[in-house]
Amino acid sequence: MISFNVPPTVGKEMTYIEEAIRSHKICGDGEFTQKCSKWIEENTGTAKALLTTSCTHATELAAILANIRPGDEVIMPSYTFVSTADAFVLRGAKVIFVDIRPDTMNIDENLIEDAVTHKTRAIVPVHYAGVACEMDKICDIAREYNLMVIEDAAQAMMATYKGQALGTFGDYGCYSFHETKNYSMGEGGALLIKDSGNIMKAEIIREKGTNRSQFFRGEIDKYTWVEAGSSYLPSELNAAYLWAQLDKADEIYNDRMESWNLYYSLLAELSEKGIIGLPVIPDGCAHNAHMFYIKVKDLNERSELIHFLKGKNIKSVFHYIPLHSSPAGKRLGKFHGTDKYTTVESERLLRLPMYYGLGEDKIIYITEMIKEFFTRIRGY
């Protein structure tokens, strides 16, 4: 069976993990955590990057820093992972879902302003598949209405919009290093902070509400509890694993881009005939090959194709069930306007195997089986 995902390994993971163990410091904020944070800062230009135990926790930390409170409203797409909404619902906010663009599956920037009310506190753009939302328009709206922008860039590290790293446009940006992401630490994430004036508070909340980070830098002679916080530090073992990935980030990026481009070229004929849809990369957007998906006619055709590919030992999967259709989404959120594309397009989308080291032979086989399905089984 060709797996849908294989967590990336580059060969130095065990070396660095053993190094962390020998250092006798395997809790958070050790040498490998600092290396990873510095790498993110240098490669994105953000003022500060704090490693976290997940992208979910990075988003929760951003919601706390943004002072999201009960009764506030936060605008986001419904086509996203539950964590995007959870972080704000936990603060008592109501999520306001806005329809997506059918080309990128990102929030439709032209529908955001109409969803703004006196209760709105933040916009949360989600860069689906590492393809940027229209950040110029979104940031303009945020400035006009004095709103925070918190980027869900879980899938978007090493992707850019007009040359600028995703995750660095908003007040805060959130990365994921889950095992399904391009760069992994098993479970983990990072919070990117744009304004250096917010760094100290973020460090305090991340460190159980203490000023422990200042203590370790020698800025104070002891640390104490200074405000409410939580524990969002990953262990050094996780950070050591991630450092192996970041040290080979360009190699991973280039390998995935080769796979993405090969998929696209081999499936272009089906797209040109109108049989399937392929990903759209708007001008000014440079993606990171996080995902390769196709779009088929409808839900039934997708189910048939998944079953067919499984019979050919290929694992393919659909993606999000729109949040507004879920039990929690109906209670805790509201869809603003018309669901013209969110549900329909989500039912068409099928993700194909994509991981570091996938290789040309597997991609050729996968695309041949897709062509066989549409020519022999579906009769196109």
Where would I find each of the regions flagged by the language model?
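N-terminal "arm"/small-domain region of PLP-dependent enzymes with the aminotransferase-like
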Residues: 1-26, 224-226, 353
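PLP-dependent aminotransferase class I/II
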Residues: 34-38, 43-47, 110, 122-126, ...
